[in-house]
Amino acid sequence: MRPKDIGTRMESKIRDVINDWAGWKACERVALHGNNDHGDLRIVVDDLVLTGESKHCKEYPSEGMLEDFKAQTITENVNAGQDGGVLFVNLTNRSVQRWEVWMQKSTFLKLHGLDSVIERYELDDAARARLEQMLVDTKHDWLRLTMAAFMHLCWGSPAWGEGE
């Protein structure tokens, strides 16, 4: 199978899994935009729109490859003008629920809402200032989640019910 076909299948699988979980059309594949790539997927979570980039790897990517994937995700998110970027890494022979999802901590804070994070963890003014800086710091650390954890973070329990 050609690499382009593998990518198309992966993007479609991510779209289908997210839409099934969310219970509505929260994710769609993005058409190519020439040299100004806008990512592979457009994902809507409440009032945020995220750019999704997908990568298929036969084995776990090296640190250098992973950094390149993250940089590409940031660039494509900027090109698309969206609220944050999300990197999906499919490793051969893993179920979709165990695919890795990488997002910047700033995207995580946008998804959770800065005020709800501060309230939940009872943070002081200094911690609030650090979190606010993370929202504008595009090179800040990334979080690694599983696909299942990402979907639960964004949409809670699946619309079709637990255990089905």
What are the language-model segments listed below?
Residues 1-164:
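Catalytic phosphate/metal-binding cores of nucleic-acid and nucleotide-processing enzymes, i.e., regions
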